[in-house]
């Protein structure tokens, strides 16, 4: 009897891959173990994630592979899930969604004997327009969503009675922009005067999991005259189907056949056969034929398409279907090339910038609150222990495993001497004296938890230290438990998935002007008030003074546009993140010519 497991990330830390009984002959032939990590929206999203699930379930049934499903909640859980899956005995690790791209690159390089698959991998290009290389044990599954979207765009335009149709996108990102570009081009190709209304639900991953906003935006587009709306918005798309049922108007689904979400009103669905790509990847790995590199699936490969069956063919007149079939043939033959981007220059609103800033601040707060809670528990567990004992090391190992962005975890005696350090690679620093560090002096004085500013650690790298006091069983101060974190690693996992898809710069600055993180990594570690790079820009220096002095606000300045080397006018918004009295200003900036008037 086959057994399948769905693990929470918390359970994963204890044992990421459970042994699953397999009694089929296929298991003996293909005894591989596969860990699949779901994208935002998770299992039962009615689309993208469910399609990946079906592909792996097929491999379980037909090939006898062992499967573990991981459903992270937020960027920190994603990091833990991926790290744990990669370190486990899984032979193949599958990440469902472009948000895993950078981390998959890192892990594939770190674990060359393990195989990795990233669905919707986010291809990076160098300054010459060439694809940046990635590890040979990483398979990047790419879909030409624009081709399937072109076909449903043609169907929508030909079917529309009002001459207006709509597009509802999730996160404003390159992949979703391909859906939009194909849909718009397909509609215009068969009906040049068609009007296409477009709305995106956000600029971060949360945009894929907001049905209420999806409903409101769909209602607005229906109210403005659109009689058909196509969504590429994950769980957010559920809001479209609610609006379609309320208005009794047409909707177009995505990824899988979504006709059940609004029976009789789903004109068609643009299908994306993630299940097939996942199954074939697992099959190749099981057979020893796995190959890395980019693999592209479009109409020709049956990687995308649209639904036309007994349930919806009555909704699509025969002449429309014939025209669309002819278009499909031209795309497959290469006679017709579908655009991947809309030719218009995308603009952001001021509200967009404020919304992104708020979401990023909230994510940083969640991470710091979790670390605070983990350290508090660690200090309680260490009470009455020898701080250099094996039991103390076990506490540190648990703490280190729960927080993947840490450099190390340690215990410190009441004389400021490092006692036990995890991981093993930093053991040589045991016995080091940290009494000269300012945050230690504050801990000694207050006997309360402390979060430091950025400093040069005895272990080498620039870091931030989080100390929690440890007391003996009779309440005497015994020392501390410390987590040394790398701000760059912590913040990149939160910020990069957003900034890589938008024309923005995002950085965190201490109140002394030190850049502890910047999307432009060359600026990390510079002090805005001291570094020569910033001195030719008096508006920037004046704004930096304002940022330091106030917890939130907005302002304008001039500085170099990343990638161009030319100064441009920019708009900035900032808020404050931090803990225990230590404040970081989180700032988002955008060139003014990329902001709506």
Model-based region annotation:
Residues 533-597:
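Extracellular/periplasmic juxtamembrane segments that couple receptor/chemosensory ectodomains to their
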Residues 389-403, 480, 484-540, 594-597:
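Solvent-exposed, extracytoplasmic
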Residues 421-492, 496-497, 551-569:
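Extracytoplasmic/periplasmic ligand-binding sensor regions of membrane-associated signaling proteins
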């Amino acid at each position: 009897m086959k057994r399948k497991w769905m693990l929470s990330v918390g359970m994963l830390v204890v044992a990421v891959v459970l042994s699953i009984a397999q009694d089929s002959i296929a298991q003996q032939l293909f005894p591989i173990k596969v860990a699949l990590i779901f994208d935002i929206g998770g299992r039962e999203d009615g689309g993208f994630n469910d399609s990946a699930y079906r592909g792996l379930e097929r491999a379980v049934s037909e090939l006898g592979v062992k499967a573990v499903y991981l459903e992270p909640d937020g960027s920190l859980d994603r990091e833990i899930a991926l790290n744990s899956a990669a370190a486990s005995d899984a032979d193949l690790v599958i990440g469902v969604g472009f948000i895993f791209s950078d981390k998959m690159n890192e892990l594939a390089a770190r674990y060359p004997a393990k195989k990795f698959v990233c669905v919707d991998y986010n291809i990076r290009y160098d300054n010459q327009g060439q694809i940046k290389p990635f590890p040979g044990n990483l398979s990047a599954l790419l879909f030409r969503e624009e081709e399937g979207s072109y076909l449903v765009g043609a169907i929508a335009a030909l079917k529309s009675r009002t001459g207006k149709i709509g597009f509802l996108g999730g996160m404003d990102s390159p992949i979703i922009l391909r859906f939009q570009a194909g849909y718009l081009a397909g509609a215009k190709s068969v009906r040049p005067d068609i009007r296409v209304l477009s709305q995106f639900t956000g600029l971060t991953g949360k945009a894929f999991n907001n049905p209420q906003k999806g409903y409101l935006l769909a209602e607005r587009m229906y109210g403005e005259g659109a009689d058909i709306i196509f969504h590429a918005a994950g769980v957010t798309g559920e809001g479209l189907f609610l609006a379609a049922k309320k208005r009794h108007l047409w909707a177009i689904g995505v990824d899988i056949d979504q006709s059940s979400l609004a029976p009789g009103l789903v004109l068609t669905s643009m299908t994306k056969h993630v299940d097939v790509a996942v199954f074939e990847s697992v099959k190749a790995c099981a057979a020893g034929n796995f190959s890395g590199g980019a693999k592209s699936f479009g109409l020709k490969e049956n990687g995308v398409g649209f639904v036309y069956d007994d349930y919806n063919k009555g909704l699509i007149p025969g002449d429309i279907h014939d025209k669309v079939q002819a278009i499909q043939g031209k795309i497959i033959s290469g006679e017709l090339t579908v655009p991947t981007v809309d030719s218009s220059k995308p603009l952001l609103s001021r509200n967009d910038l404020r919304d992104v800033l708020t979401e990023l601040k909230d994510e940083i707060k969640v991470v710091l609150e979790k670390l605070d809670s983990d350290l508090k528990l660690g200090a309680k567990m260490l009470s009455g222990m020898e701080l250099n004992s094996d039991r103390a090391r076990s506490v540190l190992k648990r703490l280190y495993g729960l927080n993947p962005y840490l450099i190390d975890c340690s215990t410190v005696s009441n004389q400021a001497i490092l006692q036990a350090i995890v991981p093993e690679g930093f053991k040589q620093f045991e016995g080091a004296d940290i009494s000269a560090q300012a945050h230690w002096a504050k801990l000694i004085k207050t006997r309360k938890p402390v979060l430091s500013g950025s400093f040069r650690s005895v272990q080498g790298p620039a870091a931030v230290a989080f100390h929690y006091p440890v007391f003996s069983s009779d309440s005497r101060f015994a020392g501390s438990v410390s987590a040394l974190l790398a701000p760059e690693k912590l913040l990149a996992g939160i910020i990069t998935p957003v900034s890589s898809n938008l024309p923005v710069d995002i950085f965190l600055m201490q109140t002394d002007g030190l850049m502890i993180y910047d999307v432009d990594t060359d600026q990390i570690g510079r002090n805005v008030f001291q570094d020569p790079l910033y001195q030719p820009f008096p508006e920037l220096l004046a704004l930096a003074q304002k940022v330091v002095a106030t917890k939130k606000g907005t302002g304008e300045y001039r500085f170099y546009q990343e990638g161009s080397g030319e100064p441009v006018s920019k708009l900035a918004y900032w808020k404050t993140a931090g803990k225990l009295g230590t404040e970081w200003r989180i700032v988002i900036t955008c060139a003014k010519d990329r902001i709506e008037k």
